[in-house]
């Protein structure tokens, strides 16, 4: 099996932990796995991207643009930012609840993620998760990455 999975979000959402769990599960199933993270601003709220390449053919742990089979996005704007990594007929799993960047919090530009979700629906096959509602049911924001991994399964 060859599969390229890109996870993206912002610092503090559990993106890296989710990628490590996927990689670990794939290795336990006997697959060769390459993974890497690119973490922007190295702080809560900075952009985080995790690359997971499952299969023998991967020469690099970084997924080239146009090669990802699945994009798992913990934040709508990060999903749009990382769309160029997807190949045709890929799937996007995205949390519809936005994390407002500092600039939005200061300027109140009205960012609520709805325009990003509408754009994503036009560009890819999407599974939209209402993060806010799911977290209320789960009772803890700390388990959201597990909810997203359930959607991947």
Which role does the model predict for each range below?
Residues 1-153:
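Active-site cofactor/cluster-binding pocket
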């Amino acid at each position: 099996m060859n599969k390229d999975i890109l996870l993206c979000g912002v610092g503090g959402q559990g993106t890296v932990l989710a990628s490590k769990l996927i990689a670990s599960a794939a290795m336990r199933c006997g697959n060769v796995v390459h993974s890497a993270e690119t973490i922007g601003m190295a702080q809560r709220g900075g952009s985080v991207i995790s690359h997971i390449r499952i299969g023998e053919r991967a020469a690099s742990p970084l997924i080239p643009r146009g090669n990802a089979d699945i994009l798992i996005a913990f934040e709508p704007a990060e999903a749009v930012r990382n769309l160029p990594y997807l190949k045709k007929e890929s799937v996007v799993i995205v949390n519809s609840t936005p994390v407002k960047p500092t600039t939005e919090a200061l300027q109140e530009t009205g960012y609520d993620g709805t325009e990003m979700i509408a754009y994503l629906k036009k560009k890819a096959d999407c599974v939209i998760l209402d993060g806010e509602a799911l977290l209320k049911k789960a009772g803890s924001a700390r388990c959201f990455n597990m909810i997203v991994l359930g959607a991947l399964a």
